C-alpha cells in the first residue's frame, strides 16, 4: 500500500499535462528506484514497532517547487525520506526532470540521485497543471 501511495502521489504531482509525456519513462526508470529506496528503508525497521507508523504524505507541492512526497512517521510527525523532482535546463539541452531524494540521516542535505527524464526544448508546465 505504501508503494501504491508513492505512485499515486507522483502522478498527482505531474498533473494531466506532464504525466502523459513522461509516464512510461517514469514507470520504467524512476519508480522502481523509488520503490527500492522505500523497501530498503523499511527493511531496516522490521524489528521495530516504528515500521507500522511509516506513511507517505498526501499532498505534493504545485507550481515550480520540488516536493513529490515525504515518507514520515505518523506518530512523531518526523520526516524520514523526502522525494523531490527538479526542473533542470542545461544550456542548449532542453528541459529535464531530475528525480532525487533526501534522508533524515544527514538532515536532508545530500541529493541522492534517482535519474532524469527529458521533457522537451520548450518550458514544461507547472506541476499539477490540468
Predicted regions and their residues:
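Local beta-strand/beta-hairpin segments that build beta-sheet-rich folds
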Residues: 79-82, 114, 118
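Histidine-centered catalytic micro-motifs
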Residues: 95-112
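Acidic/histidine-rich, surface-exposed loop or edge segments in extracytoplasmic proteins
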Residues: 5-25
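Short, low-complexity, Pro/Ser/Thr/Gly-rich segments in the mature regions of secreted, periplasmic
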Residues: 117-129
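Short, solvent-exposed aromatic-acidic interface loops
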Residues: 87, 101-103, 119-121
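Mature extracytoplasmic domains of secretory-pathway proteins
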Residues: 20-92
Amino acid at each position: 500500500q505504501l508503494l501504491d501511495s508513492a505512485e499515486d502521489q507522483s502522478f498527482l504531482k505531474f498533473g494531466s499535462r506532464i504525466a502523459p509525456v513522461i509516464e512510461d519513462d517514469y514507470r520504467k526508470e524512476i519508480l522502481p528506484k523509488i520503490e527500492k529506496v522505500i523497501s530498503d528503508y523499511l527493511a531496516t525497521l522490521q524489528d521495530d514497532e516504528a515500521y507500522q507508523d511509516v506513511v507517505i504524505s498526501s499532498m505534493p507541492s504545485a507550481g515550480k517547487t520540488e516536493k513529490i512526497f515525504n515518507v514520515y512517521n505518523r506518530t512523531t510527525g518526523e520526516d524520514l525520506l523526502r522525494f523531490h523532482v527538479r526542473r533542470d535546463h542545461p544550456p542548449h539541452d532542453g528541459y529535464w526532470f531530475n528525480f532525487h531524494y533526501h534522508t533524515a540521516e544527514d538532515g536532508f542535505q545530500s541529493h541522492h540521485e534517482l535519474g532524469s527524464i527529458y521533457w522537451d526544448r520548450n518550458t514544461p508546465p507547472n506541476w499539477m497543471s490540468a
